[in-house]
Amino acid sequence: LGDVYKRQMNKRDGNIVAFLMELEYMDVEKPSGYSPEETGSKYTQAGQDSAGLTAAVEDPESVKRPNIIVIMDEAFSDLAVRGDFTTNEDYMPFIHRLQQGAENTRTGYLNVSVLGGNTANTEFEFLTGNTIGFLPQGSVAYQQYVQKETPSLASYLKELDYHTVAIHPYYASGWDRDRVYPLLGFDEFLSQDDFTNPKRIRNYISDESSFAKIIE
């Protein structure tokens, strides 16, 4: 929604005024208590912890590797999270069964930092554990900050001999995903060009076809 407001401000006040009003948000304030030394120490410790976990897998061939699937679904919503919402029949029985404690299931809520767009920033935060809260307003981490190999869940799983695949049912070049995903450790990237006669809703590939591609 922030981008919408910016466009409205440009239209209402003109480009020069809008640009000057945005200048104050282009600088990032140093967090309270921050020091390069403390950050470096925590980074080193995190690396040691990760190395220990990886080293614990002495015989990779003997380790079971369950499929790990993460779905970020812009088209999905449960209106019940907004408050009291009742219907005469369950509108998402499968999802609700999972939430109620289905076998081998853990559920919860994940708050994200974007609304109405900039999905690449949600991906960036989830995959890397970094926050865009420390970046200038309007930043898109994929386009501006991922310029070299960057540690992520994908790269960590590669260390455990997983084959890592990213699927996005739209243009491969969107938010520079085709350039960024390999830097995050993905072995393979499937975009809309890799779908054969998918079902579409308002010109977009449907969730049904997207999930079928995952299963495939």
Locations of regions flagged by a protein language model:
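Soluble catalytic regions of membrane-associated enzymes that act on cell-envelope
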Residues: 3-216
